[in-house]
């Protein structure tokens, strides 16, 4: 028996598959590049502007956002931005000192890093909510990358290499933003970041026990086992005075966090908490001569603005491997954290941030920072949350913070030299407790077990191995999952929803009707060399499992975004196998790119235009007509 069905070209006007001439290579290449690097098409409004002067103005506003919002600035916005800027400064001072200590660099570098970068971000940043500064995870990762031996024996060289790593971070981030390679950051999934931040919080919490117990000797390793071993081995050094002060500070800080959660309008109580700890700690340590009672302090902090550090950059080939590793890994983490935080707060205000512009801003911030005695900065969650709750309207709040930090560096820095290390440890511990997102981990467990596995691999990898190994393992699991999605694409059998022309997955909609004589299958991903064998075997298995004989296979390709030659040959092979069983293959709604390749490879000629339809309903009607009119030959 030879089955022929009504050609799609005889369908009502506008209902048939469009077999127009395929686009040229140049047109397709341009389209691909646009969708890969410019999916948001940021330059379209600029290109449509007829006036050359206005076009130049818009282009300048795109690359330097301050020219967009500053002309519209008014005193009403300034009032809110000044309040927000002063509030985040109260957090920037203790965090700057604390995180510099975490990175094993002089505390004054932490203050320097809260002075220059905010000005740079205010000029080039696109988020109205982000407050920039140093972060705990990257601070610890930098120290871990260069190692205990260098930190202990060559502190000056270590500081120079940190400035160099910051330059590498900035150049890397700028290049990613300029080349619009934000897609690379997407490999750090939400699950990976949740687990990584949680694991990092655990090891940072445990490391702060050195300050809480007043220990002199302590390991620089970051895994849980080594840290606990070091604490127990040095228990003879435990100081009750330091422990008592640390517990009091920690209880106070957690109380302020509780007040903020219970009464959101009192957010400033939590924001001022770390500064209160620093001020009270300084006063008490000065009055009782804390160093004489076993309470270590920060030590001398000199007055003055950031000295230039461009002459300190070290490109010795012996250290370049470590420098590039520290710069690129911390750069990726800083980007993922900063962009994710900026976007999450922008959503709350119905605003948008441009990820690629943020990368450029972060990159310039770190490049200029590396020349002015700063180390890596990004958008920390705690500071951004305070900035948002304080009512910030524009990036001007970062300018206000920068001005306040300038005053601190010029006049107040030496006063913070009495800050007890136990107070800084309490500040860090309080901040880290908020980074362990138990609710999100439980949510991942309920919704998606594989996402939970990715999260836990980062969490335990960071906690028990190291930060970079934990990150690599988690990203590895994420990539394996993505490859599995590609290699094992979703396929489903469709049935008609009763009394409608809609066709849906019969497993999801058990009431949907199957029709005798044909089977409708839907492919939900690209078909190419990595999954073509699976696609072929899965389709043939669907057909073998049919209890009744079938005459038509209807293949819905609306979910297939692209196909390669291996995929094309697979479809032809399926057609040949089905042909030997007197089963015709019908193609439904091939996407533009897929249809172009089908035409160029002569697939359409081999299968026949009459077996290609725009919709499932059109194909079903044609098959039904054929089944009711064609009689088998005797």
UniProtKB/Swiss-Prot annotation:
Residues 508-623 form the STAS domain. Keywords: Membrane, Sulfate transport, Symport, Transmembrane, Transmembrane helix, Transport. The chain crosses the membrane at residues 82-102, 105-125, 131-151, 159-179, 196-216, 240-260, 266-286, 322-342, 359-379, 396-416, 421-441, 459-479. InterPro entries: S04_transporter_CS, SLC26A/SulP_dom, SLC26A/SulP_fam, STAS_dom, STAS_dom_sf. It comes from the Eukaryota. One of its GO terms (cellular component) is membrane. Signal peptide: none annotated. Residues 103-104, 152-158, 217-239, 287-321, 380-395, 442-458 are extracellular. It is found in: Membrane. Residues 1-12 have a biased composition (Polar residues). Residues 1-81, 126-130, 180-195, 261-265, 343-358, 417-420, 480-634 are cytoplasmic. One of its GO terms (molecular function) is symporter activity. NCBIfam families: sulP (TIGR00815). Belongs to the SLC26A/SulP transporter (TC 2.A.53) family. H(+)/sulfate cotransporter that may play a role in the regulation of sulfate assimilation. This is Probable sulfate transporter 3.5.
């Amino acid at each position: 028996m030879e089955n022929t069905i009504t050609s799609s070209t005889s369908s009502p006007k506008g209902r048939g598959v469009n077999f127009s001439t395929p686009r040229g290579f140049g047109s397709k290449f341009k389209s691909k590049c646009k969708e890969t690097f410019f999916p948001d098409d940021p330059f379209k409004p600029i290109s449509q502007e007829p006036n050359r002067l206005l076009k130049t103005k818009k282009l300048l506003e795109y690359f330097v956002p301050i020219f967009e919002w500053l002309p519209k600035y008014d005193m009403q916005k300034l009032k809110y931005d000044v309040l927000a800027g002063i509030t985040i400064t109260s957090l920037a001072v203790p965090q700057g000192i604390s995180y510099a200590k975490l990175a094993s660099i002089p505390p004054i570098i932490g203050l320097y890093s809260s002075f220059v970068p905010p000005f740079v971000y205010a000029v080039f940043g696109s988020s109205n909510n982000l407050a920039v500064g140093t972060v705990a995870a990257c601070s610890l990762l930098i120290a871990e990358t260069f190692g205990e031996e260098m930190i202990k024996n060559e502190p000056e060289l270590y500081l120079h290499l940190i400035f160099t790593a910051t330059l590498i971070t900035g150049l890397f981030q700028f290049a990613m933003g300029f080349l619009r390679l934000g897609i690379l950051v997407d490999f750090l999934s939400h699950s990976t970041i949740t687990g990584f931040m949680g694991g990092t919080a655990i090891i940072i919490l445990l490391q702060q026990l050195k300050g809480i117990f007043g220990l002199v000797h302590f390991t620089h390793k970051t895994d849980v086992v080594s840290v606990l071993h070091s604490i127990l081995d040095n228990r003879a050094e435990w100081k009750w005075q330091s422990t008592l002060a640390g517990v009091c500070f920690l209880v106070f800080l957690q109380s302020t966090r509780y007040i903020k959660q219970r009464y959101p309008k009192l957010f400033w109580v939590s924001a001022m908490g770390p500064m209160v700890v620093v001020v009270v700690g300084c006063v008490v340590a000065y009055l009782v001569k804390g160093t004489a009672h076993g309470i270590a302090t920060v030590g001398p902090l000199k007055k003055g603005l950031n000295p230039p550090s461009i002459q300190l950059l070290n490109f010795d080939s012996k250290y370049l491997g470590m420098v590039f590793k520290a710069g690129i890994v911390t750069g990726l983490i800083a980007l993922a954290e900063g962009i994710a935080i900026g976007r999450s707060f922008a959503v709350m205000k119905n605003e948008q941030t441009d990820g690629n512009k943020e990368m450029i801003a972060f990159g310039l911030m770190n490049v200029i920072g590396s020349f002015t005695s700063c180390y890596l900065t990004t958008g920390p969650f705690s500071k951004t949350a305070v900035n948002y709750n304080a009512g910030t309207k524009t990036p001007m709040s970062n300018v206000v913070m920068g001005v306040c930090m300038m005053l601190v560096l010029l006049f107040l820095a030496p006063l913070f030299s009495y800050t007890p290390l136990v107070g800084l440890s309490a500040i860090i511990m309080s901040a880290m407790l908020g980074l362990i997102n138990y609710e999100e981990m439980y949510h991942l467990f309920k919704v998606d077990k594989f996402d939970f596995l990715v999260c836990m691999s980062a969490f335990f990898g960071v906690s028990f191995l190291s930060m970079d190994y934990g990150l690599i393992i988690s990203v590895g699991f994420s990539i394996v999952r993505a490859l599995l999605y590609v290699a094992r694409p979703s396929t489903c059998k469709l049935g008609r929803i009763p009394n409608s022309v809609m066709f849906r997955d019969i497993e999801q909609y058990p009431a949907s009707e199957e029709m005798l004589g044909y089977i409708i299958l839907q492919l939900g991903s690209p078909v190419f060399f990595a999954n073509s064998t699976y696609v072929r075997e899965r389709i043939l298995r669907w057909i073998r499992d049919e209890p009744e004989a079938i005459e038509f296979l209807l293949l819905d390709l609306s979910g297939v975004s692209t196909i390669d030659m291996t995929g094309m040959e697979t479809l032809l092979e399926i057609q040949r196998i089905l042909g030997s069983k007197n089963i015709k293959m019908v193609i439904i709604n091939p996407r533009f790119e897929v249809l172009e390749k089908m035409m160029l490879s002569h697939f359409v000629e081999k299968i026949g235009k009459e077996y290609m339809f725009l919709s499932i309903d059109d194909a079903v009607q044609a098959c039904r007509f054929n089944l009711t009119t064609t009689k088998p030959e005797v």
